[in-house]
């Protein structure tokens, strides 16, 4: 009986360790941009996403081409599921205008962006960092600089 007891303890310990290693999914909200033209497109996308395991709520805004999914899901899996419907999809590339400290960076304004949104840009986020290098182009054309370009 001693061998069976030790074997059963070994097996139970093995399964206990594998249970602890399982990655728990976290509750998150995934925003995806999907081109939708009609009620059928909207219904098809909503049904495809709502049938996924772990989805708590699905909101579709056809006016700004946005699908918001809340639940215990991974963004890549939601994106793949929407692409299976035949629609082109991408992670929501915009942020609200008032959330960006300096939205005047190159590439942030997009004609296709919904009203009140600007495109996410890495350049505008880099300017917010305290140790970010600054460009001193203005000092090149000052009167105190003897090497500055002058037109007489």
Swiss-Prot record:
HMA domain boundaries: 27-90
Localization (cell): Membrane
Propeptide part(s) removed at maturation, as residue ranges: 150-152
One GO location term (cellular component): membrane
Expression (tissue specificity): Expressed in roots, shoot apical meristem, leaves and flowers.
Domain of life, per lineage: Eukaryota
Pfam families hit by this protein: HMA (PF00403)
UniProt: Cd(2+) binding residues: 38, 41
Chief localization: membrane
Protein name, UniProt field: Heavy metal-associated isoprenylated plant protein 20
């Amino acid at each position: 009986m001693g061998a069976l007891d030790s074997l059963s303890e070994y097996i139970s310990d093995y399964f206990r360790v594998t249970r602890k290693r399982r990655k728990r999914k976290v509750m998150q909200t995934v925003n995806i941009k999907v081109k939708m033209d009609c009620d059928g497109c909207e219904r098809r996308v909503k049904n495809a996403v709502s049938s996924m395991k772990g989805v708590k709520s699905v909101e579709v805004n056809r006016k700004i081409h946005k699908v918001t999914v809340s639940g215990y899901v991974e963004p890549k899996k939601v994106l793949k599921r929407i692409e299976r419907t035949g629609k082109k999809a991408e992670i929501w590339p915009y942020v609200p205008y008032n959330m960006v400290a300096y939205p005047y960076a190159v590439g942030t304004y997009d004609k296709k962006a919904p009203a009140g949104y600007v495109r996410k840009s890495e350049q505008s986020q880099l300017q917010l960092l305290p140790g970010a290098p600054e460009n001193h182009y203005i000092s090149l054309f000052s009167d105190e600089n003897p090497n500055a370009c002058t037109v007489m």
